């Protein structure tokens, strides 16, 4: 069984609120990774990013920091076009005190550009979570396996696939594809079936070879997220 890290997703408005700071401190024992979502920011630039990163560093929580700009095409609030999206990823990869960067995998995006971004991040000792999100449906099992296969051809550190299930078979297909992929690739694998019906994919992530489970501090930032303290307890049942 794979060791699973708990990532807490926070989505502050330009700066950290006191309630977010208090919650991060209170529940720090349940957290391994802080995922900072920035796609909701109206004034997005590297100075604003670095300011929040510095504020997180000042808390001295000793957690890895993952920065994510989620585009609207993959369920986020980000409205950047292709060129602006690539540019902001380059800026994030060059920021100080960032440990991990989320890069979206899209079948229409140039693999050369994706590989260039991954190499830039690695040059700066930043790990890459190559992610793909489908908020509409869950592809068939073979399509899921092929998606994982295409993603693992790039040299990221993690490959993450999140889908929307409409029945128990969708959840089983996601877990099956994640498990089979985890058995044969060198990268860490993450598979999430969103919404309440897919909760087992978050709480039993490690049983099926997954390595990160995402939780929240207050309002879920994705369908099916649960509080990190509950998530940590659920994950510990499989240890």
From Swiss-Prot:
Its EC number is 4.2.1.10. Pathway: Metabolic intermediate biosynthesis; chorismate biosynthesis; chorismate from D-erythrose 4-phosphate and phosphoenolpyruvate: step 3/7. It catalyses: 3-dehydroquinate = 3-dehydroshikimate + H2O. Keywords: Amino-acid biosynthesis, Aromatic amino acid biosynthesis, Lyase, Schiff base. CDD domains: DHQase_I. GO terms for molecular function: 3-dehydroquinate dehydratase activity. One of its GO terms (biological process) is 3,4-dihydroxybenzoate biosynthetic process. It comes from the Bacteria. The active site is at 133 (proton donor/acceptor), 160 (schiff-base intermediate with substrate). 3-dehydroquinate binds at residues 35-37, 70, 202, 225. PANTHER family: 3-DEHYDROQUINATE DEHYDRATASE. Belongs to the type-I 3-dehydroquinase family. Homodimer. HAMAP family: AroD. Involved in the third step of the chorismate pathway, which leads to the biosynthesis of aromatic amino acids. Catalyzes the cis-dehydration of 3-dehydroquinate (DHQ) and introduces the first double bond of the aromatic ring to yield 3-dehydroshikimate. This is 3-dehydroquinate dehydratase. The lineage of its organism: Bacteria, Bacillati, Bacillota, Bacilli, Bacillales. The gene is aroD.
